Every structure is written in structure tokens, then in C-alpha cells.
Regions:
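Bacterial N-terminal signal peptides
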Residues: 8-18
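Short proline/glycine- and polar residue-rich coil/turn motifs
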Residues: 78-84, 145-147
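A short, amphipathic beta-strand motif
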Residues: 42-48, 58
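Beta-strand signatures of extracellular beta-sandwich domains
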Residues: 57-61, 101
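Exposed aromatic-hydrophobic patches
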Residues: 86-92
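Extracellular beta-sheet/turn segments enriched in Thr/Pro/Gly and aliphatic residues
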Residues: 25-33, 124-163
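A short tyrosine-centered beta-strand micro-motif
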Residues: 96-102
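Acidic, glycine-anchored loop motifs typical of Ca2+
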Residues: 105-114
Length: 171
């Protein structure tokens, strides 16, 4: 399996360095939903992950926008090794309006700490203060309208760097 994964990675780089849905399918059990294209889903492209260590968690939120990102209110959650998490298919129950959060647990300890990265659909800007007091973005900034099919969403990861929370160089 590792040889197959290595071969797939080398092929992706040789063909242009982009990740494809085929690679996402190999890493994400929900990817066939995105490949088929007939069911509501979000294909999350994770940009700017600082390292391949740890895990990446993608959560989808629906329903009341005031409850987006509240603990335990997600409707779908996918977690996978960071090295395999660049395109992640998130199946959804029906067309509608959703929000996405992505967390990079850089040290894989399962706890939020200053080494972790994060991002949301719409890529709202956050300050370190926002993180400390747990401010949430305006729902209109993060909403994704999903129809009967696959909706692509690009999420740029941010990390605490000095006194700010911002993207690192894109990988």
C-alpha cells in the first residue's frame, strides 16, 4: 500500500503537482460521493498546511448560522493524517447553506494549542485576540451554498506567528 501511495504521489507531481479527486478518493472514504457528483457535497481544498505532521479535521456545519462552529454542532466530521489531507470530500444530507472549519492538529495530541493551524470557508481573517476570546466570524463570511452536486471550497490555513494569526507560505 505504501508503494502504491508513493507512486501516486510521484505521478501527481509529474503531472503538474496538483492533487486530484482520484488521490482524494484513495485517502478519504467519502470521496466516491464527490466523484459521482449527484449528491450534495463539498470538496474542501486545504491550502498552506505548515507540515505533514499530525492530523487534519474538517467539520461541516448547517442549520442555524448563529450556531456555526459551536462545540458538538457539526453535521459531518472527517479526520485524517495531514500528509493525506489536501482535498477532502464532505458529503452533506441535502442542498442548503453550510460552513466549513478545518483544523490542523500539528502535534497530533487531540488538543488545541498554539502549534495548531485553522481555517474556515470564506477564509475570514482572525487575530490572536479573536482566538483567545473565541470570537466567531460573521456567518455571511463563511457560508457556502451547496446544490445537488459537488461544491468546491478552498480553505487557507492560518497559524500563530509572532503576535498574529496568518497564513504561512503556500505548499
Amino acid at each position: 500500500m505504501l508503494k502504491l501511495f508513493g507512486w501516486a504521489m510521484m505521478t501527481a507531481v509529474a503531472v503538474g503537482g496538483t492533487l486530484s479527486l482520484a488521490r482524494a478518493e484513495a485517502m478519504n472514504a467519502a470521496a466516491p460521493v464527490c466523484r459521482a457528483g449527484g449528491s450534495p457535497a463539498i470538496l474542501v481544498e486545504v491550502i498552506g498546511v505548515r507540515s505533514d505532521a499530525g492530523t487534519v479535521r474538517v467539520q461541516a456545519y448547517g442549520g442555524d448560522p448563529a450556531r456555526y462552529f459551536d462545540k458538538g454542532t457539526y453535521i459531518e466530521r472527517i479526520e485524517m493524517p495531514t500528509a493525506q489531507a489536501r482535498e477532502i470530500c464532505v458529503p452533506l444530507p441535502k442542498p442548503g447553506t453550510y460552513a466549513i472549519s478545518v483544523r490542523h492538529d500539528a502535534n497530533g495530541n487531540g488538543k488545541a494549542d498554539m502549534k495548531d493551524g485553522g481555517g474556515m470557508s470564506g477564509n475570514p481573517q482572525f487575530s490572536v485576540w479573536d482566538l483567545i476570546v473565541k470570537n466567531k466570524p460573521d456567518p455571511k463570511q463563511v457560508q457556502v451554498h451547496v446544490g445537488q452536486g459537488v461544491t468546491p471550497v478552498r480553505v487557507v490555513m492560518n497559524y500563530v506567528q509572532g503576535g498574529s494569526f496568518r497564513p504561512v507560505a503556500t505548499r
